[in-house]
C-alpha cells in the first residue's frame, strides 16, 4: 500500500474509532417498578424509559395481572419533558405477580415490543 493511502486509512480509522454508534429503535432502558422487582407498596403508575422517543398514538402499554386481565387505567401518556418515557396509571394493585407489556413505535418509525414482570408483596 502506498504511504499516502496508508496514512489516510489510519487517520480515517482513528476518527471512526472515536465515534459513538447512533441509537436506533426504542428499546427498554429501565422501568419503574424495576424489571423483575418485588415492591412492598402498589405503584400508582408504571413508567418505562426507552432509548429514544416514541410516538404515542402508535404505542401501547398494558399491565396484566396473574390471570392475564388488563388492570391499567386508560390514561397512557408521555412525560411532557421526556418523549422517551411512556407512563400509564394503575389502580391500587393487590398482592401478586404482574406483567408489563409494551409495543412502541419509535420516532425513527421502527416498532419494538417486549414485557417484564414485577410483583407486589407487602
What role is predicted for each listed range?
Residues 39-41, 45-52, 109-122:
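Extended, polar beta-sheet/loop recognition surfaces of beta-rich domains
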Residues 1-9:
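Bacterial N-terminal signal peptides that target proteins for export
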Residues 19-24:
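Sec/Tat signal peptide C-region and signal peptidase I cleavage site
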Residues 25-43:
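Short N-terminal segments immediately surrounding and downstream of signal-peptide cleavage
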Residues 46-47, 52-74:
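Short, surface-exposed alpha-helix to beta-strand junction/turn motifs within ectodomains of secreted
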Residues 43, 95-97:
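Extracellular Ig-like/FN3 beta-sandwich strand-entry sites
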Residues 90, 94, 101-117:
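Short, exposed beta-strand-loop hairpins at the edges of beta-sheets
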Residues 10-18:
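Bacterial N-terminal signal peptides
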Amino acid at each position: 500500500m502506498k504511504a499516502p493511502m496508508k496514512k489516510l486509512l489510519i487517520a480515517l480509522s482513528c476518527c471512526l474509532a472515536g465515534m459513538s454508534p447512533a441509537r436506533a429503535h426504542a428499546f427498554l432502558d429501565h422501568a419503574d417498578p424495576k424489571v423483575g422487582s418485588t415492591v412492598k407498596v402498589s405503584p400508582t403508575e408504571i413508567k418505562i424509559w426507552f432509548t429514544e422517543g416514541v410516538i404515542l398514538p402508535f404505542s401501547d402499554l398494558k399491565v396484566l395481572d396473574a390471570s392475564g386481565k388488563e388492570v391499567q387505567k386508560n390514561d397512557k401518556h408521555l412525560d411532557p419533558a421526556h418523549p422517551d418515557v411512556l407512563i400509564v396509571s394503575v389502580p391500587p394493585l393487590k398482592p401478586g405477580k404482574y406483567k408489563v407489556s409494551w409495543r412502541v413505535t419509535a420516532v425513527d418509525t421502527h416498532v419494538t415490543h417486549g414485557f417484564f414482570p414485577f410483583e407486589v408483596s407487602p
